[in-house]
């Protein structure tokens, strides 16, 4: 039992920290999984190196398998060509054309000779060759012109003739590739801009005698510049239609102050009518004021009573005392006047 325990693989990180923990069932549960000490760092680097070596081994095995398939491809293609010399229809997209010339000097061999000269070529090595691993290529020179490749890559542009045209022109079978017409090389860049007309008198000035590529600066004619004789000065601008003056929308006026060339903004739209006010609540019932005319007139004041109680205030008392004093002073004056008369 002790020997079995000793031979059981242990966790190296736990062993670095003084613990013996079996690896079985311990994956992802180590307490020192993120430890950065010197020994644990060496363990993590060793694990990275082992993973890289494993990836390299798998890539080498895949390359060996691809090399074996490439070696078997040409053998199978040559055996199939010898067994079936008749032309086999192959899609034009998978054909890689070469020059139709042969070592014997024939200018245009027949379709049988071209079909016999076909063989399958293995494309460049890659991880996934795909369904187009075997591509038939015409025999002869290995050099292919770019124009011929473009013509075969787009068979829809120059399709084979049908009916009487095919019989009259002697169009070959499906494997016979017509020689495409050579395109006339044109300039890389075509200038579609209108030619620039420059006055030779103004092309070069005395300041720059050697600057042939410099264009003069022609300022716009403004109102304060000297105008030639017979031309009125520009004193303002007004906006006119293009039919009156083809040079632009601004023309000069014979006189007047400067006028702005913008339009006044349109008047604002009229305001919508105000909504009617809600009816005010009536505190008096309708017809109440009209009923006031039918009320009886107020009764007349009562007649004065025979017995009246007069209440004299202090001010009234003072007024009565003054009146009594005046009456008393006026009474003795009357006999004196009588005496004077006697």
Swiss-Prot record:
Q: Where in the cell is it found?
A: Nucleus
| InterPro entries recorded | DM_DNA-bd (IPR001275), DM_DNA-bd_sf (IPR036407), DMRT (IPR026607)
GO MF annotations for this entry? DNA-binding transcription factor activity, RNA polymerase II-specific; metal ion binding; RNA polymerase II cis-regulatory region sequence-specific DNA binding
Record bears the keyword Lipid metabolism: no
List keywords of the entry alphabetically: DNA-binding, Metal-binding, Nucleus, Transcription, Transcription regulation, Zinc
Give a yes or no for keyword Kinase in this entry. no
SMART domains, sorted? DM
Chief subcellular location equals: nucleus
* Top-level taxon of origin: Eukaryota
Give the intrachain disulfide bonds.
none
Please give the DNA-binding region boundaries.
11-58
Which segments show compositional bias classed as Pro residues? Answer: 263-284, 295-305
Biological process terms in GO annotation: regulation of transcription by RNA polymerase II; sex differentiation
Tell me which GO cellular component terms the UniProt record holds.
chromatin; nucleus
What does the tissue specificity note say? Testis.
Low complexity bias spans:
331-342
Q: Where is this region: Disordered?
A: 91-131, 245-342
Q: Which family does it belong to?
A: Belongs to the DMRT family.
**Protein name per UniProt:** Doublesex- and mab-3-related transcription factor B1
Q: What is the lineage of its organism?
A: Eukaryota, Metazoa, Chordata, Craniata, Vertebrata
């Amino acid at each position: 039992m002790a020997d079995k325990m000793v031979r059981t693989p242990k966790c190296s990180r736990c062993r670095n920290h003084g613990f013996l923990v079996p690896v079985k069932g311990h994956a992802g549960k180590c307490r020192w999984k993120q430890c950065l000490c010197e020994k644990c760092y060496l363990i993590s680097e060793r694990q990275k190196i082992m993973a890289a070596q494993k990836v390299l081994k798998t890539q080498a095995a895949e390359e060996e398998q691809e090399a074996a398939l490439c070696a078997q491809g040409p053998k199978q293609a040559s055996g199939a060509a010898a067994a079936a010399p008749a032309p086999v229809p192959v899609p034009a997209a998978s054909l890689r054309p070469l020059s139709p010339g042969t070592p014997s000097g024939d200018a245009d061999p027949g379709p049988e000779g071209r079909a016999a000269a076909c063989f399958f070529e293995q494309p460049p090595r890659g991880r996934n060759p795909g369904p187009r691993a075997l591509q038939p290529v015409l025999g002869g020179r290995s050099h292919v012109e770019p124009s011929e490749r473009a013509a075969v890559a787009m068979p829809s542009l120059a399709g084979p003739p049908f009916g009487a045209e095919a019989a009259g022109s002697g169009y070959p079978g499906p494997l016979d590739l017509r020689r495409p017409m050579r395109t006339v090389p044109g300039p890389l860049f075509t200038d579609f801009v209108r030619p620039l007309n420059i006055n030779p008198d103004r092309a070069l000035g005395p300041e720059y005698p050697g600057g042939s590529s410099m264009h003069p600066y022609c300022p716009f004619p403004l109102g304060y510049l000297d105008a030639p004789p017979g031309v009125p000065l520009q004193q303002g601008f007004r906006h006119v239609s293009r039919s009156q003056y083809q040079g632009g929308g601004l023309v000069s006026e014979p006189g007047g102050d400067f006028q702005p060339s913008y339009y006044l903004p349109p008047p604002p739209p009229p305001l919508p009518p105000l909504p009617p006010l809600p009816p005010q609540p009536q505190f008096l019932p309708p017809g109440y004021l009209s009923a006031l005319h039918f009320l009886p007139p107020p009764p007349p004041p009562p007649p004065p009573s025979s017995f009246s109680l007069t209440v004299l205030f202090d001010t009234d008392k003072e007024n009565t005392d003054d009146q009594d004093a005046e009456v008393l002073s006026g009474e003795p004056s009357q006999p004196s006047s009588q005496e004077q008369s006697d």
